[in-house]
Amino acid sequence: MARCERLRGAALRDVLGRAQGVLFDCDGVLWNGERAVPGAPELLERLARAGKAALFVSNNSRRARPELALRFARLGFGGLRAEQLFSSALCAARLLRQRLPGPPDAPGAVFVLGGEGLRAELRAAGLRLAGDPSAGDGAAPRVRAVLVGYDEHFSFAKLREACAHLRDPECLLVATDRDPWHPLSDGSRTPGTGSLAAAVETASGRQALVVGKPSPYMFECITENFSIDPARTLMVGDRLETDILFGHRCGMTTVLTLTGVSRLEEAQAYLAAGQHDLVPHYYVESIADLTEGLED
């Protein structure tokens, strides 16, 4: 049972010694805004030298995989391959490739509520986008899925159009994630994809398929490409309701870092209330603290 214990000393060495790999969330874990968390790049280098696999799982749907890889490099995280990066945008593209209804000779289109990074990921997967000039001439393909991602230009008109498509019972409703809000550098909040998805669900009367954390579907995307034993894998994140719940659902050892959204007091409150799926096994002040558990 998870007890939210501080990870240090002999326990830290034991946990990292048994682990074959680590899954990291990105925002609030590796970096905040345009600044890497102090010591985070060095930790990843040490993990690589120790032969521990590191993979990265983000609910952020704003960047396609190549752009996300560039951000890692810009913030000082060198030596990583794009194949190590898994975003909710990438996983949404995979799900739509698998489940988009319609005959093979008449593939349907996806109506996207989201930015250019999400659209680029879908195009890279060979999907057609509603209203996309790149779809070519001729009759517009039938919309067979509505995808809700992070959309800074969300509007009533977009909501109305999404609902019109969803009147077709065969049209899928997919959301990249349910993060309700995101913190800003000034301490305020901005609405997240979860808020937009809730609006579409309420207005359409439909329930979205969610691909991002805490959905195990994201873990399925990872295990399609990497051989992972969840019992010997750590999930390190900053958000109890997404990262830690995701880790528990997938059978991993969970570690909360306090450099992001969730506070230690919240985890302790969940522990007192018996909501153990939201309680991390361990916590650290920063992921840089994990370096002490690795042998030179």
Swiss-Prot record:
GO terms for cellular component: cell-cell junction; cytoplasm; cytoskeleton; cytosol; glutamatergic synapse; lamellipodium membrane; postsynapse; ruffle membrane. It is found in: Cytoplasm, Cytosol; Cytoplasm, Cytoskeleton; Cell projection, Ruffle membrane; Cell projection, Lamellipodium membrane. Keywords: Cell membrane, Cell projection, Cytoplasm, Cytoskeleton, Hydrolase, Magnesium, Membrane, Metal-binding, Pyridoxal phosphate. Gene3D superfamilies: HAD superfamily/HAD-like. Functions as a pyridoxal phosphate (PLP) phosphatase, which also catalyzes the dephosphorylation of pyridoxine 5'-phosphate (PNP) and pyridoxamine 5'-phosphate (PMP), with order of substrate preference PLP > PNP > PMP and therefore plays a role in vitamin B6 metabolism. Also functions as a protein serine phosphatase that specifically dephosphorylates 'Ser-3' in proteins of the actin-depolymerizing factor (ADF)/cofilin family like CFL1 and DSTN. Thereby, regulates cofilin-dependent actin cytoskeleton reorganization, being required for normal progress through mitosis and normal cytokinesis. Homodimer. This is Chronophin.
